[in-house]
């Protein structure tokens, strides 16, 4: 199999959350990409998509959190505009467990792709709420409650018409 075929196999295992099989396939992909770069004497080596997925799998399959973070960070350094890389990094931090860093990673991913479904789902599962209407006041302040209910009722009315 080629490096690309191992990469696709690894990605398929990641989608199934079969971390051990994904890690094995992605390690083989990484190895073959490195061999390919050496043979071609080129500077391009392992694609950042592989690095990011490898980092996630290292954390999930073998609890190698620090190494997982490093791989995810390398992917982000190579290609900082990919929300998926921040999603993977956030999952690694959740495994750590470091909820604060996980949230920062997820929010950075949402800045790049506000409609990233997996990040949104993860934040929802974590119980993250939207900011209060008047963010300079506490969430339970009566003005925040009043305006929140007012906006929510107006939204429901406009959706029903």
Language-model-detected regions and their locations in the chain:
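TPR/TPR-like (Sel1-like) alpha-helical repeat modules
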Residues: 27-31, 94-135, 141-148
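Residue-level recognition of tetratricopeptide repeat
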Residues: 11, 56-57, 91, 125
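Generic detector of contiguous secondary-structure segments
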Residues: 2-38, 104-116
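Alpha-helical adaptor scaffolds
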Residues: 19-20, 27-85
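Intrinsically disordered, low-complexity, charge-biased linker/tail regions
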Residues: 1, 7, 15-20, 66-70, ...
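A short, hydrophobic/aromatic-rich structural module that often spans a beta strand
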Residues: 69-107
């Amino acid at each position: 199999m080629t490096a690309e075929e191992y990469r696709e196999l690894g990605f398929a295992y990641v989608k199934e959350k079969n971390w051990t099989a994904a890690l094995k396939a992605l390690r083989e992909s990484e190895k073959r990409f490195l061999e390919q770069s050496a043979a071609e004497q080129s500077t391009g080596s392992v694609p950042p998509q592989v690095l990011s997925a490898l980092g996630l799998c290292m954390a999930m399959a073998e609890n190698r959190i620090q190494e997982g973070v490093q791989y995810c960070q390398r992917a982000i350094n190579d290609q900082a505009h990919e929300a998926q890389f921040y999603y993977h990094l956030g999952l690694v931090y959740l495994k750590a467990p470091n909820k604060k860093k996980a949230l920062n990673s997820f929010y950075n991913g949402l800045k790049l792709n506000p409609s990233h479904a997996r990040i949104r789902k993860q934040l929802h599962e974590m119980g993250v709420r939207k900011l209060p209407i008047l963010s300079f006041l506490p969430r339970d302040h009566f003005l925040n409650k009043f305006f929140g209910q007012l906006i929510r009722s107006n939204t429901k009315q406009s959706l029903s018409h």
